């Protein structure tokens, strides 16, 4: 079966063997206290990655995606339109990825967790899509664990799910998130119950570590 994330032609970042796509070596992290227990296994956990069809910051999609795959989970790419997603590296076009499921057809009960990558254009476009906002709201109502990074929290404000929450983000979102009822903190990664948030691509090692732990803990408790 073809994996849902595309092959890449950048040998220094991805490797393609006889079996097709093979994930990069594990992400190096900056913490000596990384959890390596069985609770971090995501076997059987289906994780929705929700992005716009254009504008997602590539690393904020691919690195959590790889972390979920390495832990045994099943990442699934959702977008408003079928076809492909155009990733960016800041302002430059990067790789494309095939959409697995249109968010129009997606329901929270079909997934065990949600990841919202960043990218300014991605987040701005996504918050204007009614089905994307509906899906995010459903995930919170169903108490699904959620990971969000950089500009990703914009859609959380649109979905009206931030009242009483504490999270971090790209600094320019601070006022928007506080106006939506959240407490904003400037931290590499912040965990508020089953909501994991980080500020920027430099925070990805910590973000991926906590995301896998929180997703696995939630799956183990069901």
Where are these regions (language model features)?
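Catalytic nucleophile serine of serine hydrolases
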Residues: 150
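Extended, subdomain-level signal for the structured scaffold at the beginning of enzyme domains
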Residues: 20-22, 27-142, 146, 155-166, ...
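Compositionally biased, intrinsically disordered low-complexity segments enriched in Pro/Arg/Gln/His
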Residues: 13-15
């Amino acid at each position: 079966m073809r994996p849902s994330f595309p092959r890449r032609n950048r040998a220094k970042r991805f490797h393609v063997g006889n079996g097709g796509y093979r994930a990069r070596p594990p992400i190096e992290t900056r913490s000596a206290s990384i959890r390596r227990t069985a609770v971090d296994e995501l076997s059987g956990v289906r994780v929705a990655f929700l992005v716009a069809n254009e504008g997602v910051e590539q690393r904020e999609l691919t690195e959590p995606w790889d972390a979920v795959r390495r832990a045994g989970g099943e990442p699934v790419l959702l977008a408003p339109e079928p076809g492909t997603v155009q990733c960016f590296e800041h302002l430059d076009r990067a790789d494309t990825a095939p959409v697995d499921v249109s968010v129009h057809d997606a329901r929270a009960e079909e997934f065990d967790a949600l990841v919202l990558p960043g990218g300014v254009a991605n987040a701005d476009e996504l918050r204007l899509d009614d089905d994307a906002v509906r899906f995010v709201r459903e995930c919170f109502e169903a108490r699904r664990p959620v990971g969000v990074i950089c500009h990703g929290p914009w859609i959380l404000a649109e979905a009206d799910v931030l009242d009483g929450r504490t999270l971090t983000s790209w600094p320019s979102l601070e006022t928007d998130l506080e106006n939506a009822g959240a407490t904003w903190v400037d931290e590499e990664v912040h965990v508020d119950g089953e909501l994991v948030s980080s500020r920027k691509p430099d925070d990805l090692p910590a973000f991926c570590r906590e995301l896998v732990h929180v997703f696995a803990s939630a799956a183990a408790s069901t």
